[in-house]
Curated annotation (Swiss-Prot):
SUPFAM superfamilies: Glycoside hydrolase/deacetylase (SSF88713). Keywords: Carbohydrate metabolism, Hydrolase, Magnesium, Metal-binding. Its EC number is 3.5.1.-. Probably catalyzes the deacetylation of acetylated carbohydrates an important step in the degradation of oligosaccharides. It comes from Danio rerio. This is Carbohydrate deacetylase. Mg(2+) binds at D14, H133. Its cofactor is Mg(2+). The lineage of its organism: Eukaryota, Metazoa, Chordata, Craniata, Vertebrata. GO terms for biological process: carbohydrate metabolic process.
């Protein structure tokens, strides 16, 4: 078999969110559309997801959640991580509280450690990789605590959400372009922190420009071709190697973040406060159908793109 040009990890995020999402992720995995999953251990259907992962031998990591729903740690009552109702502050609320200087990093650390331990209880082994729900793991101050937790537990892979060519994706609405630009800035500033703690990541990250209705064969082609063009010249790749020349003779490694599934029903799913609009959208089904489309799978084969998982690294 010829050497692949790209070793692509296609990660289905938010495993555990609800049973319909879980089933959609499993169906996508069994059809060859994804090769890896990321578990929300504080989600209401996390146990259901864990049982499915073991049944179907799904490579699985931890999608650490500090922004949605209820905490795992039982010692966070009155915590700066939580609002007056006892829930996390939300995607933007978490960032606002962090930037105001009100978050205690000791509480962030306690919750991250509790989630790793819950993952082990559910799955029976440590996560093959660990990232952050809504990209919280690359935020200032959080990144240092996150990296230390991974180092302490021996978790060696994470996600660095910097997507080649993203700045040219003018089809994205302005609010998403603004959010994505900040995510990339935070991610770039996390590189040295992760590197210093012995944490690795794929050479290329994809997924910010291909979410929901923006996922289609032409858009996946564009994103993957941008990753190939980026190749070994990427500063993220060179950061991870003391011998950059050797990278010329190995495949590019990449992660594609995806969110397939069957849409959540009202009042079903979530992380303790019900499902959000994102989970109830038909965009989930659109991603599922696109990822398992024979045209997409054939494109991978034609381009020398081999689907794999973090554990294969």
């Amino acid at each position: 078999m010829p050497q692949p040009k790209v070793k692509l990890v296609v990660t289905g995020d938010d495993f555990g969110y609800c049973e319909r999402r879980n089933q959609g992720i499993v169906d996508c995995f069994r059809a060859g559309g994804i090769s890896n999953v990321s578990l929300l251990v504080n989600a209401v259907s996390a146990k259901h997801a864990a049982d499915l992962a073991k049944r179907y031998h799904m490579p699985i990591g931890l999608h650490a959640n500090l922004s949605e729903g209820l905490p795992v740690s039982q010692e966070l009552k009155g915590s700066t991580l939580l609002n007056k109702d006892g829930f996390f502050h939300g995607k933007m609320g978490f960032r606002e509280v962090l930037h105001s200087g009100q978050l205690k990093m000791s509480e962030v650390e306690a919750e991250l450690r509790a989630q790793v331990n819950r993952f082990f209880e559910l799955i029976g082994h440590m996560p093959y990789h660990m990232d952050g729900h809504q990209h919280v793991h690359v935020l200032p101050d959080v990144r240092e605590v996150f990296a230390q937790v991974l180092s302490d537990f021996g978790i060696t892979y994470t996600r660095v959400p910097i997507e080649p060519g993203l700045r040219f994706c003018n089809f994205l609405p302005s609010h998403l372009r603004e959010f994505n630009a900040q995510v990339e800035k935070d991610a770039l500033e996390s590189v040295e922190v992760f590197h210093r703690n012995g944490i690795r990541w794929p050479d290329v990250y994809l997924g910010l420009s291909t979410m929901g209705k923006n996922m289609c064969l032409s858009n996946l082609k564009r994103a993957l071709e941008a990753s190939l063009d980026d190749g070994v010249s990427s500063p993220l790749i060179l950061t991870q190697s003391n011998n950059a020349a050797s990278n010329c003779y190995r495949p590019v490694t990449a992660e594609l973040m995806v969110h397939p599934g069957y849409p959540s029903q009202p009042q079903q799913g979530g992380c303790g406060e019900g499902p959000d609009d994102f989970s109830q959208s038909t965009d989930r089904l659109h991603e599922l159908n696109t990822l398992r489309d024979p045209m997409v799978l054939n494109f991978y084969r034609q381009q020398g793109i081999h689907l794999c998982a973090f554990k294969d690294f």
